[in-house]
């Protein structure tokens, strides 16, 4: 479930994007990855809702919500939070075989 108080303790962090003029120079990722420690903090923010809308890709009032791949987000967040990286990757592969 992550950390029960994680949503309150940790602010949401998103990966910084490389400036467009810089990223058109190559085919590298254009978001700077968060550190493993920061990824674990973000995993701790999961509240394990009774009905987790985060794992169902849907449109609500014209805006996309949730995961369009139907990833098992709460389980994955908990695995990231506890540092079980291989199991977290395995969990993602169940719904997304990655290119």
What are these regions (language model features)?
Residues 1-99:
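Ferredoxin-type iron-sulfur electron-transfer modules and their immediate structural context
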């Amino acid at each position: 479930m992550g950390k029960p108080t994680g949503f309150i303790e940790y602010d949401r962090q998103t990966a910084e994007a490389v400036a467009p003029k810089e990223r058109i120079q190559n085919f590298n990722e254009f978001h700077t990855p968060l550190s493993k420690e920061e990824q674990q903090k973000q995993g701790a923010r999961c509240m394990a809702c009774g009905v987790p809308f985060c794992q169902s890709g849907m449109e609500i009032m014209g805006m996309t919500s949730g995961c369009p791949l139907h990833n098992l987000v709460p389980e994955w967040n908990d695995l990231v939070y506890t540092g079980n990286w291989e199991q977290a990757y395995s969990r993602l592969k169940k719904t997304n075989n990655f290119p």
